[in-house]
Amino acid sequence: MASFMKQLSLVLSFIALALAGCAVYQNTQTAMKDQLKVTPTWLDNTLKSTNLLSLGLGKPSGGKLGDEACVFSAVKEVVVAAINAEARMGASLIRLFFHDCFVDGCDAGLLLNDTATFTGEQTAAGNNNSVRGFAVIEQAKQNVKTQMPDMSVSCADILSIAARDSFEKFSGSTYTVTLGRKDARTANFTGANTQLVGPNENLTSQLTKFAAKGFNGTEMVALLGSHTIGFARCPLLCISTFINPARVSTLNCNCSGTVNATGLVGLDPTPTTWDQRYFSDVVNDQGLLFSDNELLKGNTTNAAVRRYRDAMGAFLTDFAAAMVKMSNLPPSPGVALEIRDVCSRVNANSVDPCEESRLLASPD
């Protein structure tokens, strides 16, 4: 009988992995490890806890859903660890996602290093010495490959998941990310210089650039609400056209002397807490960036700022919806696409494992 139960447990382990993915598989393995009896009651409870019964045991889509669940789990594992090690990383990953998708769609073009045939986007004005989190995305990519070697997931997908997980980690809210994006085989340095919104842009310019991507003024304000977390670097803030003049005296950057090159200033006074303080500051003329305070100059944007200041639920809902919309911005027509083996370069005939290890170990 004991031998039969052991065999049954092994069979259930493989069935569970194929049909329900990570959750049932891990529960089954725990039962085996702890030498629990695999009874009909135990199996029924396990299936119910993972919603397998609602999927239908015979549906072929169960395997795909399980695979995708494992992908999401593998990415979240890396993202959460990175944020736990450095809270600033959450805002950095959201910004990395935004700066990628806003230039020619979500194609991971921003992740590409310069090559002999093109200049990447990382040294464009809005990105240079600013965007970060590349190593986290590379590590998440490797974790997916390790845990799901037969699952091909693009760097663009991983970046989209990482941004969602960062939002979830800080806000406690979430939204759905679908898979299926592909990675560009080139980057657009010129596009990064012209399409991204800078901290010195007036309201008209901001609205024009967001409208070009299909976003209205309210959606723009919701997305800019991500400034509720994160920091700005002193070298940027010491550029007079980038900062709200009312905030100059609050900085500790030594802008009149030798600028504190490594100094950071919170985008709002609570830069590691997802709250409504950003909107309160904008209403009170205390937004850090020039572009932040411009939001009060339009009827629609002014109303949105005040609404989100007063209603966290509305802010979370609208931000999530705008992020879903952002994540679905398509690559430019005609751009060659692939699923990269390493996020920082286009595919070759093979990937040098030593080079891949070096890339994964390198700092941002």
Swiss-Prot record:
Transition state stabilizer, annotated site positions: 95
Expression induction: By wounding and cold stress. Weakly induced by acclimation and strongly induced by chilling treatment.
GO molecular function: heme binding; lactoperoxidase activity; metal ion binding
Keywords, in A-Z order: Calcium, Disulfide bond, Glycoprotein, Heme, Hydrogen peroxide, Iron, Metal-binding, Oxidoreductase, Peroxidase, Secreted, Signal
Residues the record marks as active site: 99
Chain residues that bind heme b: 227
InterPro entries xref list: Haem_peroxidase, Haem_peroxidase_sf, Peroxidase_pln, Peroxidases_AS, Peroxidases_heam-ligand_BS, Secretory_peroxidase
Gene Ontology cellular-component annotations: extracellular region
Signal peptide: 1-20
Glycosylation sites: 113, 188, 202, 216, 254, 260, 299
Co-factor(s): Ca(2+); heme b
The keyword Signal belongs to this UniProt entry's keyword annotation: yes
Domain of life, per lineage: Eukaryota
Binding, Ca(2+) 1: 100, 103, 105, 107
UniProt family annotation: Belongs to the peroxidase family. Classical plant (class III) peroxidase subfamily.
Task performed by this protein: Removal of H(2)O(2), oxidation of toxic reductants, biosynthesis and degradation of lignin, suberization, auxin catabolism, response to environmental stresses such as wounding, pathogen attack and oxidative stress. These functions might be dependent on each isozyme/isoform in each plant tissue.
Protein name (record): Anionic peroxidase
